[in-house]
């Protein structure tokens, strides 16, 4: 027989409560645990990518910024007017023409600089005589004491006295000592200067149909070229005859 007052709840033993689902607190904790892990992984990936970029492009930040600016400027220009191939050919032709013109100008400048003042103040065959003198003089200086050359010089004897040259050099208070080569060079320079000035004065005398070289001829020769302006205190300037 059964007891009518029997309650099914009384006959059943204690039942354990089954978790219906994850509690909110546990979900928050798991998310908090996963976030640092994900963040560390992302940070590591970014560092690896940065190291890879640095190994591929070993440039500084300033250079990288300049490259970006140049790319932006190039992207903003309109390239439709002239194709790159045509532009390259035109630039090549222009560069070739300019190089050729520059080469010709350089050669002309060199020739002009060498004999720029040689014929200054002279005309006709007088100018040709002076240019020929300087050409022969340059060739002689370059070939002196060379093997097989006819121009040999021991630099021990000159037309001008070395003692007089040393005395003139010592008039400068800043000159304390004079080497053995200095008077030789000064003597050669003085010899060239006197020879050229004599030739210029002779051109003046011959033009005036005279055979005697006078002081007026030297003064007139000095006035015809600005190379001799340093002698203005020695030889006063006079009006040139018409």
Curated annotation (Swiss-Prot):
Belongs to the NFYC/HAP5 subunit family. Acts a component of the CCAT-binding factor, which is a transcriptional activator and binds to the upstream activation site (UAS2) of the CYC1 gene and other genes involved in mitochondrial electron transport and activates their expression. Recognizes the sequence 5'-CCAAT-3'. HAP5 is essential for DNA-binding activity. It may be the linchpin that binds to the subunit association domains (SAD) of HAP2 and HAP3 to bring these proteins together. Component of the CCAT-binding factor (CBF or HAP complex II), which consists of one copy each of HAP2, HAP3, HAP4 and HAP5. The assembly of the HAP2-HAP3-HAP5 heteromer (HAP complex I) occurs in a one-step pathway and its binding to DNA is a prerequisite for the association of HAP4. The gene is HAP5. Gene3D superfamilies: Histone, subunit A. This is Transcriptional activator HAP5. Keywords: Activator, DNA-binding, Nucleus, Phosphoprotein, Transcription, Transcription regulation. Disulfide bonds: none annotated. It holds the Pfam family Histone. Residues 91-108 have a biased composition (Acidic residues). GO terms for cellular component: CCAAT-binding factor complex; nucleus. Transmembrane segments: none annotated. The modification Phosphoserine is found at residue 7. GO terms for molecular function: DNA binding; DNA-binding transcription activator activity, RNA polymerase II-specific; protein heterodimerization activity. Residues 1-108 are annotated as: Disordered.
